């Protein structure tokens, strides 16, 4: 029913500032009765991290920062949901306004600054869903004023790993000063070693993933993928939002706002980086493709570039939750048209071409 209501609600939501509209959406989802997700085409199933994903279409971090509506989101048909980002201590993030729509570009700019209710609140909610169906992961970061950011990631891992299927180490948000410095090889090596050790000490089997910035140079990507392989990282999420502003943006006045750009204009940049990442790691580290997915064609391109799973968020602002089913149906049709019974043969098959042309 929520799919059918979105076209009616969209003008009302878009008449509000973007953050208020989002807060109302979260509130509305929290009021929905429990709903089993629709059955998925068996050809869309993906085995990854020791988990059976019913379909490859996930919700990216940032939508449900407080882990308040993960089950409602799974009920909309997502194959998995990533909650967060979460930091140890509650923090308000940057001053409002801090999120901006670019409707003609089908894009969003945000500078939230990892606003978070903190580790205790999110851990309690994730613990409370123990035994429920559905794959939920969590994105973790560091407090803006932290004296020891590495310790922040360790604290989040130790507390949250027992309650999730995967933990995504976020060192690529552009909205926390100095956070991307942790992508440097020496810092990253130490960080990942500590996070993996904290996961192991917790007794959890949660996979540890690393989220990459789209603005990284290829030399930096070489170092980052080598570090991820060395430290046994089980997945790479490609990519976060970009600080770049493509010349093609129509909403030029809004484009001047600082923050990370997501949505359709990020598609080419993030898909090229995804393909470049696949060319470096192949099947040794599974990839999750994120950035500009707003159709089955875009999701298919991410898979051809090397993604086993995909995530979206910004497109929901414009297309609503019905987009999830539209993408899944489109992927199923593609597989049937090619006579395939799974997505596995498609993963990375065009990575070399897409690294050049996306």
Swiss-Prot record:
Query: Among its keywords, does the record have Transcription regulation?
Result: no
| Biological process according to GO | 'de novo' pyrimidine nucleobase biosynthetic process; 'de novo' UMP biosynthetic process
Which reactions are catalysed by this chain?
A: (S)-dihydroorotate + a quinone = orotate + a quinol
What's the domain of life for this entry? Bacteria
Query: CDD domains under this entry?
Result: DHOD_2_like (cd04738)
Task: Note how many cofactor molecules are bound and how.
Answer: Binds 1 FMN per subunit.
Q: Where in the cell is it found?
A: Cell membrane
Question: Residues that bind FMN, according to the entry?
Answer: 61-65, 85, 139, 170, 211, 239, 263, 292, 313-314
Query: Signal peptide position in this chain?
Result: none
Keywords per UniProt: Cell membrane, Flavoprotein, FMN, Membrane, Oxidoreductase, Pyrimidine biosynthesis
Binding positions (substrate)? 65, 110-114, 170, 175, 240-241
Keyword match Flavoprotein: yes
Active-site feature positions: 173
**Subunit and interaction comment:** Monomer.
UniProt lists the family membership as follows: Belongs to the dihydroorotate dehydrogenase family. Type 2 subfamily.
Show the NCBIfam families listed in the entry.
PRK05286.1-2, PRK05286.2-5, pyrD_sub2
Put simply, this protein is called Dihydroorotate dehydrogenase (quinone)
Species of provenance:
Methylorubrum extorquens (strain CM4 / NCIMB 13688)
Q: Which gene encodes it?
A: pyrD
């Amino acid at each position: 029913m929520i799919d059918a209501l979105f076209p009616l609600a969209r003008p009302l939501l878009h008449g509000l500032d973007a953050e208020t509209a989002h807060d109302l959406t979260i509130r509305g989802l929290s009021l929905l009765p429990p709903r089993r997700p629709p059955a998925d085409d068996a050809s869309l199933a993906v085995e990854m991290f020791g988990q059976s994903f019913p379909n490859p279409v996930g919700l990216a971090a940032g939508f449900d920062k407080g882990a308040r509506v993960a089950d409602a989101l799974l009920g909309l048909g997502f194959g998995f949901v990533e909650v967060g980002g979460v930091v140890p201590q509650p923090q308000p993030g940057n001053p409002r306004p801090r999120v901006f729509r670019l409707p003609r570009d089908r894009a969003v700019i945000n500078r939230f600054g990892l606003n978070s209710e903190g580790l205790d609140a999110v851990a309690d909610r994730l613990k409370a869903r123990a035994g429920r169906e559905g794959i939920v992961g969590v994105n973790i970061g560091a407090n803006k004023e932290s004296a020891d950011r590495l310790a922040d990631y360790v604290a989040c891992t130790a507390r949250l790993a027992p309650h999730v299927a995967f933990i995504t180490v976020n060192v690529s948000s552009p909205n926390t000063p100095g956070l991307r410095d942790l992508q440097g090889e020496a810092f990253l090596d130490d960080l990942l070693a500590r996070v993996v050790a904290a996961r192991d000490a917790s007794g959890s089997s949660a996979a540890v993933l690393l989220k990459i910035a789209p603005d990284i140079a290829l030399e930096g990507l070489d170092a980052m993928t080598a570090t991820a392989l060395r430290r046994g990282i089980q997945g790479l999420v490609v990519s976060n939002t970009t600080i770049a502003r493509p010349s093609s943006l129509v909403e030029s006045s809004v484009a001047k706002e600082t923050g990370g750009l997501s949505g359709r204009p990020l598609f080419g940049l993030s898909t090229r980086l995804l393909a470049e990442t696949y060319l470096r790691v192949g099947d040794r580290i599974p990839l999750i493709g994120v950035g500009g997915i707003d159709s089955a064609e875009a999701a298919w391109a991410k898979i051809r570039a090397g993604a086993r799973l995909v995530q979206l968020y910004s497109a929901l602002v414009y297309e609503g939750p019905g987009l999830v089913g539209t993408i899944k149906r489109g992927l199923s049709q593609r597989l049937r048209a090619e006579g395939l019974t799974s997505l596995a043969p498609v993963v990375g098959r065009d990575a070399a071409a897409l690294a050049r042309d996306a």
